[in-house]
Amino acid sequence: MLKVVSILLGASLLFSTAQAGIWRKTSPRGNSLPKHEPPASFERRANTIFPIGVSSVLDDQPALLETNKFYSSFMIDGPERAAWTLPYIISVNDELPFGIQVAYPKSFEGEREGDRLKWYATTRTKDIILSAVELHTNQEVALADFDDAGLSALVTLSSPTEAGSMQTWLVRGMAYTTVLYNSYTPEVSSIHAIVRVNGRAVSGRTHTSSTGRFVLELNDDTTWIVYSSDTTLGLTYVSAVDDIPSVLKATKPMSGTLRVTRVPYEITTPEHPQYDAAVALLDQYSGSYPTKGSLTTWMHKTDTKRGKYQIKWTTAGDGSGLLHYAFPHHQDKVRSSTATRTGIYLASPTKGDMELLTGTTWIVNENTLPDFEWIPSMSGITYDRQMAWIMYYLEAEISVPLLKEEVAGASVYFGAKHLMAYCQLCLVAAELGSADLLETCLDQVEENFDEYLQHTNGNALVYDTVWGGVIGEEGLKEGNGAADFYASFYNDHHFHYSYVINVAAVLAHLRPSWIDDTKVAWVNTLIRDVNSPDASDPYFPQFRAFDWFSGHSWARGLLFAYDGKDQESTSEDVNFYYAMTMWGIATGNTLIEGLGRLQTGVVTRSINEYFLLKDDNQNHPPDFVKNKVTGIFFESKVDYTTWFGGNVEYIHGIQNIPATAITESVRDAEFCKQEWEQRLESVVETAEGTWNTVLYMSYATIQKNAAFEKILTSGSDAGLKRTWALYWAATRPPCDDFCSHDTVVLPHAPVVQTGAFSGVPATIPGRIEAEEYDLGGQGVGYSDTDPGNSGGQFRPSEAVDIQIFGEGYNVGWMRDGEYLRYTIEVSETGEWLRYFSVASPTSLGSFHVVTGGNGCGDNSAKNLSGMVAVPNTGGWANFAALGVAGNQPLSAGQTEIWLCVITGGFNLDFFDMSRRVL
C-alpha cells in the first residue's frame, strides 16, 4: 500500500459525546488546506537527488516520500542506511553477515572548555545483528511502506537468488526490534562476545527454549533477550571465521518473528534493584509489536489555551499489549487512562531517559498553550524617552527604500528574513498609530513581496516533482547544490518559509485588500510543503519537518549525517508555527490557526526540555548544561557550536532570532537570567555585528531599561531593525522573581533637522557641491548602502562616503541604489543644463536626476535627466565635466532633486546648473 491513512473510528470510545463536542479536529483532515495541484506559477522541476531503495509499490506516487524523517537515509545514496528509532539505532549491515544491526548508543564526552563540556556524542556498535543464512551471498534492501505522520517505516530484505525474505518495522520508541522471517533461516550475532545463552556457556551446544526465549549475556556487561514466535527454534553456536563474527544459527528455516531487546540495566554486582522488574516487564509484553503509528490532533473550540494530540500505535502479534519507550516531554503529559508509566528507564542519546509505557494509545494534553499577538502591546512602554527614540528610528528606517537584491535576491532565507525585519516596522507603525508611516511601509513590503509571488526573485521557487515539495531553483544548477543552505534538498525549509509566511500574514492583517485567492493559494503551498496536515494530500507529504514524537522539527533533509537529523535554531523552528498560526488568523482559517497554536505549544515545551538548558535540566550531562543552550542538536550528538562558527554570540543568538511576540512564551525570565549571567554578559561587548543587539534583546527580559540603552548604539542591519529591537526591549513585561528593570536615565532622542545643508537652499543657476546634500540622515538626505563613512573626512557621523580632493571634498564609493538629495531654489521656470564633475576608471557607472514625489524609486517622480552614463575618465582622481541637457522643466521656487545611482563605481565632486537657452 502507498500510504496508510489512519482514521480513528474508535475516537468516540475515548471521549464522551459531551467531550467530543468541545474539540475541533485539526489533523488529519482534508479541508484545512486545499489538496489541489500547486499553482502553475511554481514551475515543475525534477530534483537532482532521486530516491533509491524504495519498493516498487511506492513508485507511482514518489511525491509522498518523506524527506526529513528519522529513516530517510534508507532512501538516499549515503554511506549507510540507518534509522534513529530511539533509544535504539537500527541500520543495515552491509558486510557479512548481511541483515539488520541493532545498536544501543552509549554516551561519551568530547572536548571540554574549563568546567564545561562542549560536545558529547554516542558510540554505535553492532550490539545485535539479525541475519539469515539465505543472505550470505548478497542482499537487497527496500523501503516498503511508511505511515503518514512519520512515526514508522517498513523495510524488506531479500536475496535475488533465494526465495523468502526478512521484514523489520522501524517505529519511533520501539522497545524491541522485530524481524519477520519468511522461510528464512535466522542467525543472531554480535560485535561483542556472547558469553552465555539462558545461563549456559554459548559454545558446544544447540540452545532451545520451550517458550522461545533466549537470554544473551554479552561481554560488555549487557543483557539482551531474543524472543522467537516459533518455540521449536534451536540456535547452534558457530565460531567466528575471518572477519565474520560468531553466530547463533537456527537449525531450520522459520516463518515468524524474532524480537530482540536490551535489558535497561547492565549486569552489576549487586544487581540494579529494578533489573528483575525490567526483565519481567519485557517478558510480559514480548508477544506484541508495533507496526505503524497514526496521529490525530485537536484544539478546544473556545479555549485557545487547550489542545491535545493522540499517537495511536497499530500492533501485531499475540495481542498481549504494547510496551513502548517515551521521551521526557511525554512522560508526565500522557493521559494515564490510556497509557501507563512503568518507572523503567533507558537513556536516549540526546534527550535524557526514556521511560517504558504500556498501552497502544497516547493522548497528550497541552493545557497551557501560549497567547498569540501580532506585536507586544505598546502599553508596556512606560518611559516617554523610550517612545521618542522608537519613533525617531521608526521614521528613519521606514524612509530607507528596500533594495530588491537585499530582500529578493539569490537567497530566500536572507531575502525573506530582511523583508520580515522591515515588515516588523509596519507592525510598530500600526501599533503606534502612525498612519502615514504605515502606508509607506506596507507599500514597500507589498512591492517587494510581489517578487516572490511572481517568481522573479533571485532564487525562484519551483515545485519538485520527484519528492513533492517547493524548492529553490538555484540549487538544481550543476555544482550549485549548496545554494541557500542546501534548501533544494529540503534543508531548513521551515526556517526559510517561516519568514515568507510571516510577511504574508502581516500584509493580510494590516492591508486586508491585499488578499485574494491567488495569494492565499500561493502561501498555502509553502505551508503544505513544510507542514501539510492532510494525510491524503497527493502533492506533499504530511508534516515534512515536524516530528510529533520528538516534539519539534528537524532541519536536515536529504543530506546524510552519521549522527542523524539535526537542528540548531529553535527560535526559527517556533517562527514557522507562529507564522502559520498568524496566517490562519489573518485569513480566517481556524483549522490552520488551531493546528499552529498546538504545534507552537508542543515545540515550546520540547525546546525547554532539550535545547534551552536551565540549571536543573536533567536531560543532558551536568557539565553540558552549563552551556545553557545546546548548539547543533543531532539525534545522537549535541555540539555547542553552529554551522557557521563557534562564537558564543552565534551559538546563543541563533536560538533567539527572530524575536517576535511569541518569543517571551519560549524564553522565560528564569532561563534568560541564567543564560545572561553564566554565558552572555562576559561576551556581549565584543560580539560581532548585530549579534550584540540580539543578546541585549534577551537581556531585556530581565533588565529592559539597561538593555534599551545598550541597543541605542549596538549593531543593526537589514535582518534586524533597531526600531524593532528597541520596541521589543521597551515592551518587556514585569516579572516577580528573575527581573528588576532598574531605572536608567536616557538621553533625549534627537530632533531631526531636515532641509538644505547650510539651512539655505542652493541657488540655481549655480554650483552644488556633492558633499553638501540635505540634512535628515539616512533615508532623508541620503541613502547609503555600505556601513560607515569610508572616507571619514567630512560629516563623519553620516554614512555617505566622503574623501578629500584638492582643497575640498568629493563623494566616492558610489554603490547601486544609493541616492543624494539636494534642496534648491530655482530662479525661474525652464529647462536647465547640468555639468557633472565625475571620475571613474571604468565606463560602468550610471545615474539619473529626479524631482517630485518621494524621489528615487517613486514612479510619480519626474526624471530630469534620463539615464546618464559615466565615462571612463582615466582614474578615480581624474575628474571630467559631463554635460547633460535638461529634458524636463523645473518650476521657479524651492524644490528637491535627487541624484539616484543606478550603477555604482564612480566619484562625484560637484555639479553646475545653468539656464538652457531654447
Name what the model sees in each region.
Residues 409-430, 487-527, 569-577:
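Aromatic-rich carbohydrate-recognition surfaces in CAZymes
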Residues 519-527, 547-548, 593-604, 840:
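Active/binding-pocket-proximal capping segment
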Residues 750-918:
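Extracytoplasmic
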Residues 570-574, 579-603:
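Active-site neighborhood of glycoside hydrolase catalytic domains
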Residues 429-443, 508-523, 584-597:
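Structural helix-adjacent loops and short alpha-helical linkers that scaffold large soluble proteins
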